[in-house]
Amino acid sequence: MEFFISMSETIKYNDDDHKTVFLKTLNEQRLEGEFCDIAIVVEDVKFRAHRCVLAACSTYFKKLFKKLEVDSSSVIEIDFLRSDIFEEVLNYMYTAKISVKKEDVNLMMSSGQILGIRFLDKLCSQKRDVSSPEENTQSKSKYCLKINRPIGEPNDTQDDEVEEIGDHDDSPSDVTVEGTPPSQEDGKSPTTTLRVQEAILKELGSEEVRKVNCYGQEVESMETTESKDLGSQTPQALTFNDGISEVKDEQTPGWTTAAGDMKFEYLLYGHREHIVCQACGKTFSDEARLRKHEKLHTADRPFVCEMCTKGFTTQAHLKEHLKIHTGYKPYSCEVCGKSFIRAPDLKKHERVHSNERPFACHMCDKAFKHKSHLKDHERRHRGEKPFVCGSCTKAFAKASDLKRHENNMHSERKQVTTANSIQSETEQLQAAAMAREAEQQLETIACS
């Protein structure tokens, strides 16, 4: 602790531990859900937080809150980040530290840029400054972040593949970047996606909250043309006027699909071939998401509900499921009063009243209320029929079409059920007839 005495004999004290204690207390309140006035939903996972902390750490949230003027019960859903990435970003806001896997370092920095987090944005800029075109073509080694820990700080990292990044007074000397970027593959420029991101981020820096559509012809042609050299182009040379539109003012109060829909994945994850799940035909932009999804088809469900024995792959999904047993439905429709357990379910329902169709097909003019309907529609454009009947090998583009086909054409159970119902009805009629006959006989005996 330091203190100063001025000429007027006024004593001033500086509490060096205040910042640490302040952050620790705020983080404890967040983890306990105390005084949280905002909930962020990412991939159906809800994160409670304090609005003032989000606005102080992120220029994106600051502009978003000013535009929406949300109240204390607001829930905001963002669909351009992975839930695990946002969880680490949120932990950084409250602890000034980030733990990130090496393969997710680039994604973490891109997410930090979009959210307007100064520390992650600076890391991304330092990483770009260190890399050079000569290194891109001569070296095959990967980027490596070397973080200098403060003396005496324990190492809680259990996985050697996790890098812990700390914001220590924003000192550039604490963070160094070693290694060289990966070599170019198939003639593609490794900076192409980054330049596209920079151009989009420049648009996101405006005062209005914007919605990004990255499936424009200019972007797609640049990413898919292997022989075209974009090294000499600058971010300012890329235009996205046709693909960027402002969020409509008549959007439902208290709700927002922040900064774009599923098309924003084109920017955030880069242009990649879609990976298809062999079990259900659902497509994914990277293998990590596919592996996470494949757990749904396996028996590995360690989180079991004690009330109905239903299993789940994550603890967050189990918590959402438990709301069904309690009957607690905190999300109510302002139009008809219908209540829902989850925020995404309410959002889907509200589109019934507003007729909002935010999911537009980039191949035609059709738009849809739900993302799943858009995916089914896009499969028809591509001619994909991933859902195959196990009895006759007939293929379908939608899972519902396959189920309908199996019920109509191969449902032996349905035929047995129908036969049983007919037999049961016949037995009931026979029993009723026998009862009437017995009553008539009793009446005859009584009269005689």
From Swiss-Prot:
Q: Which residues does the UniProt record annotate as the domain BTB? A: 36-102
Q: Which GO terms describe its cellular component?
A: nucleoplasm; nucleus
The protein's matches in SUPFAM superfamilies, at most eight in alphabetical order, are given as:
beta-beta-alpha zinc fingers, POZ domain
Molecular function per GO: DNA-binding transcription factor activity; DNA-binding transcription repressor activity, RNA polymerase II-specific; RNA polymerase II cis-regulatory region sequence-specific DNA binding; sequence-specific DNA binding; transcription cis-regulatory region binding; zinc ion binding
Alphabetized, the UniProt keywords read: DNA-binding, Metal-binding, Nucleus, Repeat, Repressor, Transcription, Transcription regulation, Zinc, Zinc-finger
Q: What is its main location?
A: nucleus
Where can this protein be found? Nucleus
- Identify the domain of life: Eukaryota
Zinc fingers, C2H2-type class: 275-302, 303-330, 331-358, 359-386, 387-415
The record's listing under InterPro entries reads: BTB/POZ_dom, SKP1/BTB/POZ_sf, Znf_C2H2_sf, Znf_C2H2_type, ZnFinger_BTB_dom_contain
> Which residue spans adopt a coiled-coil conformation according to this UniProt entry?
none
- State one Pfam family annotation: BTB
Ranges of biased composition (kind: Acidic residues): 156-167
Give the record's GO biological process terms.
Answer: negative regulation of DNA-templated transcription; negative regulation of transcription by RNA polymerase II; regulation of cytokine production; regulation of immune system process
Q: Where is this motif: Nuclear localization signal?
A: 50-66
Q: Where is the composition biased (Polar residues)?
A: 416-425
* Composition bias type Basic and acidic residues, residue spans: 404-415
Please give the subunit comment from the record.
Interacts with ZBTB21.
> What's written under domain?
The BTB/POZ domain seems to direct the protein to discrete regions in the nucleus.
The record's comment on protein family reads: Belongs to the krueppel C2H2-type zinc-finger protein family.
Protein function: Transcriptional activator of the dopamine transporter (DAT), binding it's promoter at the consensus sequence 5'-CCTGCACAGTTCACGGA-3'. Binds to 5'-d(GCC)(n)-3' trinucleotide repeats in promoter regions and acts as a repressor of the FMR1 gene. Transcriptional repressor of MYC and thymidine kinase promoters.
Please report the name of this protein according to its UniProt entry.
Zinc finger and BTB domain-containing protein 14
Q: Which organism is it from?
A: Gallus gallus
